Amino acid sequence: MRNIKLIIEYDGTAYCGWQVQPNGRTVQEALEEALASMLGGKTALHGSGRTDAGVHARGMVACFQTDKGMPLRAFREGLNCLLPADIAVREACEVPLEFHPRFDALAKHYRYTMLLDDLRSPLSRLTAWRLKGKLDVDAMRSACAAFVGEHDFAAFRASNCAAKTTVRRIYSMDLVQEGPFLHLDVKGSGFLKNMVRIITGTLIEVGQGKKSVEDVARLLKGSDRQQNSGMTVPPQGLCLMQVYYPE
């Protein structure tokens, strides 16, 4: 038996998230259908985590096990021939049988992209959230520093989040300006449901002068989503960039 690790890129616009569910088309479902067609039978695919409806990925990691002796290049090219245009396997490699993409992950890097422009951009509408008006980016950067470290992120999760613990560690959080685009890059041990989107919404309110760095610190000391943390920004600006594993 072989354990095949895939690095997957996808445009999440048309999907109800990563994980298979009864109420809509998902990325995992499309990949498992392609695997079944290529390998001649149902094959379970295990991902490094979930992304919500409309969220994208450049570096989702997933694994499947097979006894097929195909070369690795054939797995990648075969799947890409069967997958729709909005999903692609970027890499395929063989890993030890005990490797699990979720449980062995050390950290994840997410990026949220904002378009700071009073005029709408048709070409960016599916990969960035447009904001009108100016933001105090320096104040937002100061607030980013408050999130770094281990904190209880209960105030920065969806109301229906079912995680057993809300403590997470953020390794780095940076804002990168690229022309009219402002990217929030967050690297952490793991993330609660909607956590990055709520953090982004909170930082935007700091940039608009509606919240202060002290407000952010106070929210991190609380344990209730009802504390008036920031809005949950739309999903299209969010992208899973990379998942990190031990060398």
From Swiss-Prot:
SUPFAM superfamilies per the UniProt record, alphabetical: Pseudouridine synthase
Domain of life, source organism: Bacteria
Residue stretches in coiled coil: none
Reaction catalysis annotation: uridine(38/39/40) in tRNA = pseudouridine(38/39/40) in tRNA
Listed Pfam families: PseudoU_synth_1 (PF01416)
Keywords: Isomerase, tRNA processing
Entry keyword Ribosomal protein: no
Listed InterPro entries: PsdUridine_synth_cat_dom_sf, PsdUridine_synth_TruA, PsdUridine_synth_TruA_a/b_dom, PsdUridine_synth_TruA_C, TruA/RsuA/RluB/E/F_N
Keyword tRNA processing: yes
Gene Ontology MF, one: RNA binding
Biological processes annotated in GO: tRNA pseudouridine synthesis
Binding sites annotated in the UniProt record for substrate: Y110
Entry's EC annotation: 5.4.99.12
Active site as annotated: D52
Subunit structure: Homodimer.
Family that this chain belongs to: Belongs to the tRNA pseudouridine synthase TruA family.
HAMAP family, alphabetized: TruA
Function: Formation of pseudouridine at positions 38, 39 and 40 in the anticodon stem and loop of transfer RNAs.
Protein name: tRNA pseudouridine synthase A
Taxonomic lineage of the native organism: Bacteria, Pseudomonadati, Thermodesulfobacteriota, Desulfuromonadia, Geobacterales
Gene (name only): truA
